[in-house]
Structure formats: structure tokens, C-alpha cells
């Protein structure tokens, strides 16, 4: 595992970050990439769509999965082709990738930073105890 400062430097230098997970409860790794300003290409599964706003902070790759709990694609070749297509789309348009990265950084800060989480938690507690 890389030290945090090295990982941050790599993600900050990256134009695009790819997360081809077939199972991801939330996808902290995507938030880390977004916080560093990288456009994210991730699988539309689990919690990834709650982090990556398709067409705003990056792109989501569609996936049809077996219903056995493994996350295995029904058609692995189709999933790989879709992943390659979306990745090519993002990396072929550096201006759009930068826009995704900037929007992702803003979303990570505004919605997922510790300050944002604390504000949301305080507001919820205030509402529940009012």
C-alpha cells in the first residue's frame, strides 16, 4: 500500500481514475480520486452511483449482474467492452475530463468532507430533537 502523500500526489496528477469494481458498498476510493480532482470512471453498482454523478463528476459503466451476490457480470465481455468505451470517451476529451474532475472535487468537498458530514449530522439531530 502506498503512503497517503504518495497516493494523493498520484491521484492529483491523474486526469482519470478507473474503478472497475463489481461490488463496492460506497466507494471511498472514488471519493479520494474526486477530492484530488480526477475524473472517475466507475461501475454503476453498489454505492458507486451515490458517489459518482454520471455525466457530472465522471461516468458510470452499466453492468448487469448475476443475482448470486457475487457481483459477477452476466456478460463479462459486454462489461469489459462498455468499460473500454466509457474510458475511451473520457480520456479522448481532456477538457471534459477536467470538468468532471473539478465537479468531483467540489462534490467531494461539499457533500462528503468531514465538515459536510458534521453539518448534516448536526442538522439531523436538531431536527430529531426539535
Question: Language-model segments: what does each one mean?
Answer:
Residues 27-30, 48:
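Short glycine/serine-rich donor-binding loops of glycosyltransferases
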Residues 55-77, 89:
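A short acidic/histidine/glycine-rich donor-binding loop in glycosyltransferase catalytic cores
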Residues 89, 110, 114-130:
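C-terminal alpha-helical cap of glycosyltransferases
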Amino acid at each position: 500500500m502506498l503512503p497517503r502523500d504518495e497516493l494523493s500526489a498520484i491521484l492529483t496528477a491523474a486526469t482519470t481514475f478507473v474503478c472497475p469494481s463489481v461490488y463496492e458498498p460506497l466507494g471511498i476510493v472514488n471519493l479520494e480520486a474526486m477530492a484530488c480532482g480526477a475524473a472517475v470512471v466507475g461501475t454503476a453498482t453498489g454505492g458507486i452511483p451515490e458517489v459518482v454523478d454520471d455525466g457530472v463528476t465522471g461516468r458510470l459503466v452499466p453492468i448487469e449482474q448475476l443475482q448470486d451476490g457475487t457481483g459477477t457480470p452476466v456478460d463479462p465481455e459486454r462489461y469489459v467492452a462498455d468499460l473500454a468505451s466509457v474510458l475511451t470517451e473520457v480520456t479522448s476529451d481532456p477538457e471534459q475530463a477536467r470538468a468532471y474532475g473539478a465537479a468531483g472535487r467540489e462534490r467531494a468537498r461539499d457533500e462528503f468532507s468531514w465538515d459536510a458530514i458534521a453539518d448534516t449530522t448536526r442538522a439531523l439531530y436538531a431536527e430529531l430533537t426539535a
